[in-house]
Amino acid sequence: MIERVRTDLYRIPLPTRLTDSTHGAMMDFELITVRIEDSDGATGLGYTYTVNHGGAAVATMVDKDLRGCLLGADAEQIEKIWQSMWWRLHYAGRGGHATSAISAVDIALWDLKGIRARTPLWKLFGGYDPVVPVYAGGIDLELPVADLKTQADRFLAGGFRAIKMKVGRPDLKEDVDRVSALREHLGDSFPLMVDANMKWTVDGAIRAARALAPFDLHWIEEPTIPDDLVGNARIVRESGHTIAGGENLHTLYDFHNAVRAGSLTLPEPDVSNIGGYTTFRKVAALAEANNMLLTSHGVHDLTVHALASVPHRTYMEAHGFGLHAYMAEPMAVTDGCVSAPDRPGHGVVLDFERLGRLAVG
């Protein structure tokens, strides 16, 4: 039985200024942590994040709206608790803050389940292969070409064997020149992806895809807004590229509709905003049923368990906004891969003493 729920909010400065085509400059991110303690004293940890804004709203949803779904509930009945949270928040918001709040709780519940079972989550989820290929997600739209190459060299030195860069500069020629320079720097066979962060119109995305065709991109991510299913389906048909998307699809139904419409070819859920492991695994099943590979967005220390448990995964995104500095045992990248930890639960241990100096409110 769940006895205690603790929610904390932290504002964590980013190691460097990050920029993409839609969100502008990012100077910090907000980390929302949820700790759930059962009557036997075991505690599960979950977390989600926002960039620059919105963290207080997520934390408040957990504290004021979801706490009632948790206290006194059987922590083993995760699906039942998930449904209770979903319908409690359904009218207030079916995505964004609502599913981020649900995610943090759901992740904590699964962590608690793994801890009590003394089993890592990737095994609890069925187990496939703990070694997962990763790519370095650069948030680098404003970097000059020389710095872009330096960043790539740093990624390579850190063990990465695949890289994603940002596109969506005001002039398409700038994007072409930057991608060309990095492709030449990395070599023709190196897996290189690009992310437009929804910057382009449908016609603009098709023009950009054709202009970038010579560089043999592994995929193009979020070429336009995900809400335009018809437009994205046209991009899929006419671009000649694999089209990834999902960080802004926040429900199972969003992914179902996108897959049914043919508006993406590579689903990319984020376990910290999709509704936690519970929904992520349903999206994984949806992808498998439609003969699609599966990637992910963000929080790779958590995501690795979900991808290590399925056969149809491809490269997992690895970026943590500097959160590794506050982890006891962050995952290391070796020859382009990370290994899911064998510790019970998800195995992430945060240094709350250090984080305490960054607490908000």
UniProtKB/Swiss-Prot annotation:
Reactions mediated catalytically: 3,6-anhydro-L-galactonate = 2-dehydro-3-deoxy-L-galactonate
EC numbers, comma separated: 5.5.1.25
UniProt-listed SUPFAM superfamilies: Enolase C-terminal domain-like (SSF51604), Enolase N-terminal domain-like (SSF54826)
Active site: 166 (proton acceptor), 297 (proton donor/acceptor)
InterPro entries linked to this entry: AHGA_cycloisomerase, Enolase-like_C_sf, Enolase-like_N, Enolase_C-like, Mandel_Rmase/mucon_lact_enz_CS, Mandelate_racemase_C, Mandelate_racemase_N_dom, RHMD-like
Uses described in the biotechnology field: The AHG metabolic pathway may provide a useful platform for the efficient production of industrial chemicals and biofuels from red macroalgal biomass.
EC class name: isomerase
GO terms, molecular function: hydro-lyase activity; isomerase activity; magnesium ion binding
Annotated positions binding Mg(2+): 195, 221, 247
Protein function: Involved in the degradation of 3,6-anhydro-L-galactose, which is the major monomeric sugar of red macroalgae. Catalyzes the isomerization of 3,6-anhydrogalactonate (AHGA) to 2-keto-3-deoxy-galactonate (KDGal).
Protein name in UniProt: 3,6-anhydro-alpha-L-galactonate cycloisomerase
